[in-house]
From Swiss-Prot:
SUPFAM superfamilies: t-snare proteins. One of its GO terms (molecular function) is SNARE binding. Part of the SNARE core complex containing SNAP25, VAMP2 and STX1A; this complex constitutes the basic catalytic machinery of the complex neurotransmitter release apparatus. The SNARE complex interacts with CPLX1. Interacts with STXBP1. The interaction with STXBP1 promotes assembly of the SNARE complex. Interacts (via C-terminus) with KCNB1 (via C-terminus); the interaction increases in a calcium-dependent manner and induces a pore-independent enhancement of exocytosis in neuroendocrine cells, chromaffin cells, pancreatic beta cells and from the soma of dorsal root ganglia (DRG) neurons. Phosphorylated by CK2. Phosphorylation at Ser-188 by DAPK1 significantly decreases its interaction with STXBP1. Residues 1-13 have a biased composition (Basic and acidic residues). GO terms for biological process: exocytosis; intracellular protein transport; neurotransmitter transport; positive regulation of calcium ion-dependent exocytosis; positive regulation of catecholamine secretion; positive regulation of norepinephrine secretion; vesicle docking; vesicle fusion. Belongs to the syntaxin family. It comes from Bos taurus. This is Syntaxin-1A.
Length: 288
């Protein structure tokens, strides 16, 4: 009969090599994934920092009736940088999302896939939070610019309601603000100059908001659909932490009780030894 031991051993070694290759490939894939996660997190942090800088520029521009061009250019650069970085983040998150959907379509389920889904959900939520802050910052700045325009119109003797001013802004025509204003004083001219400056800022803002609107809504809807899953994960994590803390507490109590019991046993043994010595001495004295 032919001995197939060597053949079987070779086949087993080949299977082992395949398993090692798969494991190494999977580990390399996850390493690359986590590098991508860190890159995305860095981009989101950069957006957050730029948003804070945008707030400072807004305050500087509003503090001056005629802000210098350098400050306005720096603000535009910040807004442009936020837009570019946000598009990068969106593209990378979309890529991860598609990869996850492909694996789910093949009915694959693994710890690695769950990790990737959790990371993707966390990053998506963080991204939307940062962009929401940026959107709120822009909206607040628009309202402040609008308020300044209204005050300057009042200086020229022209009173407008909030609704009327909104209609004027939506017209996109700067000349509409000069209508009915008598340009007979330097105050009126200065007021009109600031009105035109603020109106220009509002137009830029609205263009920026419009450009980011579709991306923002897309990511917001994604996060909303993931919300329930994220809440469930957070609930499980919190309860796992509580369980671990209780387990540690119970372990400490057990060690404490065990230590007390051990000390009691030692005391009993010592008492028995002392009692034995006393009895032995007593009987020794009697029979001595």
């Amino acid at each position: 009969m032919k001995d197939r031991t060597q053949e079987l051993r070779t086949a087993k070694d080949s299977d082992d090599d395949d398993d090692v290759t798969v494991t190494v490939d999977r580990d390399r894939f996850m390493d690359e994934f986590f590098e991508q996660v860190e890159e995305i997190r860095g981009f989101i942090d950069k957006i957050s920092e730029n948003v804070e800088e945008v707030k400072r520029k807004h305050s500087a521009i509003l503090a001056s009736p005629n802000p210098d061009e350098k400050t306005k250019e720096e603000l535009e650069e910040l807004m442009s940088d936020i837009k570019k970085t946000a598009n990068k983040v969106r593209s990378k998150l979309k890529s991860i999302e598609q990869s996850i959907e492909q694996e789910e379509g093949l009915n694959r389920s693994s710890a690695d896939l769950r990790i990737r889904k959790t990371q993707h959900s966390t990053l998506s939520r963080k991204f939307v939070e940062v962009m929401s802050e940026y959107n709120a910052t822009q909206s607040d700045y628009r309202e402040r610019c609008k308020g300044r325009i209204q005050r300057q119109l009042e200086i020229t003797g022209r009173t407008t309601t909030s609704e009327e001013l909104e209609d004027m802004l939506e017209s996109g025509n700067p000349a509409i603000f000069a209508s009915g204003i008598i340009m007979d004083s330097s105050i009126s001219k200065q007021a009109l100059s600031e009105i035109e400056t603020r109106h220009s800022e509002i137009i830029k803002l609205e263009n920026s908001i419009r450009e980011l609107h579709d991306m923002f809504m897309d990511m917001a809807m994604l996060v909303e659909s993931q919300g329930e899953m994220i809440d469930r994960i957070e609930y499980n994590v919190e309860h796992s932490v509580d369980y671990v803390e209780r387990a540690v507490s119970d372990t400490k109590k057990a060690v404490k009780y065990q230590s007390k019991a051990r000390r009691k046993k030692i005391m009993i043994v010592i008492c028995c030894v002392v009692l034995g010595i006393v009895i032995a001495s007593t009987f020794g004295g009697i029979f001595g």
